[in-house]
Amino acid sequence: MSSVVVVGTQWGDEGKGKITDFLSENAEAIARYQGGNNAGHTIKFDGVTYKLHLIPSGIFYKEKISVIGNGMVVDPKALVEELKYLHDKGVDTSNLRISNRAHIILPYHIRIDEADEERKGANKIGTTKKGIGPAYMDKAARVGIRIIDLLDKETFKEKLEHNLGEKNRLLERFYELEGFKLEDILDEYYEYGQQFKDYVCDTSVVLNDALDDGKRVLFEGAQGVMLDIDQGTYPFVTSSNPIAGGVTIGSGVGPSKINHVVGVAKAYTTRVGDGPFPTELFDSIGDTIREVGHEYGTTTGRPRRVGWFDSVVVRHARRVSGLTDLSLTLLDVLTGIETLKICVAYKLDGKTITEFPASLKDLARCEPVYEELPGWTEDITEVQSLDDLPVNCRHYMERIAQLTGVQVSMFSVGPDRAQTHVVKSVWRLA
């Protein structure tokens, strides 16, 4: 039995999809455990670029099981569209399994999400307006509708009727928007469910059976630790738990069955949406990193905010997710920058702090304490191993490992699978 969790250590968009795809080659099951179609990941497979939002990266390996876990919230319409997108590209999806316990996103969730962001104005969270938060709210309030409910038309109708009474009052009286009629949703969404019903099962059984049979299972996190609803920059966070602890809740696999946790980090830092960002760059270096790194959101197309690598953030991620390994991505983007900076601590009211503050008010007042390192000019996109990297690049990686307290077991120097390199296997048994 061997299991690996892949988590983002920053604010998402770290390259988790690429690393998950790379590690999938040696896995026999790949599972997502939280989030929904608010998270986009880009994968290159057999020379073709794919952009997925719901379906796990392992879908391209027809001999491997791909799982949408119970901790996810699934937009049935988006799922059907993504399946069609893959089928149109000739991808076989018969290896997909969808948890019967996963909750679904309905049109009223999306409308409420949009209206709430609009109402908040300058205080908006910066959501993707995909209905994720409202769907998780319904789950916590115990009025959510699960995939198992969607497949039974009588149950679906009963729950939908009940919810529409409440949601329409909210939309019409509070947001002053038009509500929904039962017939606007019932038949259309029931039909979506019928289109993917053959994939639906108890995925906890599937995953535990795989582990008990000695198979390798890979858990794919979405977003990142700093967007975790408990451990992130609350309230500028997502509505679920991307940290490694979310695996046990969102997949139905116990913590004793998790072996290694791989934290994926960019060689710099990015963020989409609002909230404090201590190392954010507003100069030409930031612009260069954004353009060279193609830093635009997969889901929204929004330009990402760019900053220097923040070891305070990744140390926090190490602690709350129990990182055993670090995968450093987009090293090639930093090529040509004469002097690189790593944030080693913050200054808050004249005092140096080395741990990430819980208070956003404090975080907004934090000034980064930087350590400067010489950059490199050599093209690193064709290197085949750690030893091939320029000395300054290796020193940069070594310093990150020292400051974060996590060994760098993988690094990538470009978008292709062949540009990801292993220093130490994360599938090791010890």
Curated annotation (Swiss-Prot):
Q: Name one GO cellular component term.
A: cytoplasm
Task: State the reactions this protein catalyses.
Answer: IMP + L-aspartate + GTP = N(6)-(1,2-dicarboxyethyl)-AMP + GDP + phosphate + 2 H(+)
A Pfam family the protein falls into: Adenylsucc_synt
The UniProt note on the cofactor reads as follows: Binds 1 Mg(2+) ion per subunit.
Q: InterPro entries in the record, alphabetically?
A: Adenylosuccin_syn_GTP-bd (IPR018220), Adenylosuccin_syn_Lys_AS (IPR033128), Adenylosuccinate_synth_dom1 (IPR042109), Adenylosuccinate_synth_dom2 (IPR042110), Adenylosuccinate_synth_dom3 (IPR042111), Adenylosuccinate_synthetase (IPR001114), P-loop_NTPase (IPR027417)
Q: Where is the active site?
A: 13, 41
Provide the residue positions that the database annotates as binding substrate. 298-304
Q: Is Secreted among this UniProt entry's keywords?
A: no
Q: In which pathway does it act?
A: Purine metabolism; AMP biosynthesis via de novo pathway; AMP from IMP: step 1/2
Q: Where does Mg(2+) bind?
A: 13, 40
Q: Where in the cell is it found?
A: Cytoplasm
Q: What is its EC number?
A: 6.3.4.4
Keyword Transferase in the entry? The reply is: no
Q: Which UniProt keywords apply?
A: Cytoplasm, GTP-binding, Ligase, Magnesium, Metal-binding, Nucleotide-binding, Purine biosynthesis
Q: What is its main location?
A: cytoplasm
- Which cofactor is essential here? Mg(2+)
Q: GO terms for molecular function, please?
A: adenylosuccinate synthase activity; GTP binding; magnesium ion binding
The free-text function statement in the UniProt record for this protein reads:
Plays an important role in the de novo pathway of purine nucleotide biosynthesis. Catalyzes the first committed step in the biosynthesis of AMP from IMP.
Question: Record's family?
Answer: Belongs to the adenylosuccinate synthetase family.
Name the UniProt record assigns to this protein: Adenylosuccinate synthetase
Q: Organism classification, top ranks?
A: Bacteria, Bacillati, Bacillota, Bacilli, Bacillales
Gene it is expressed from? purA
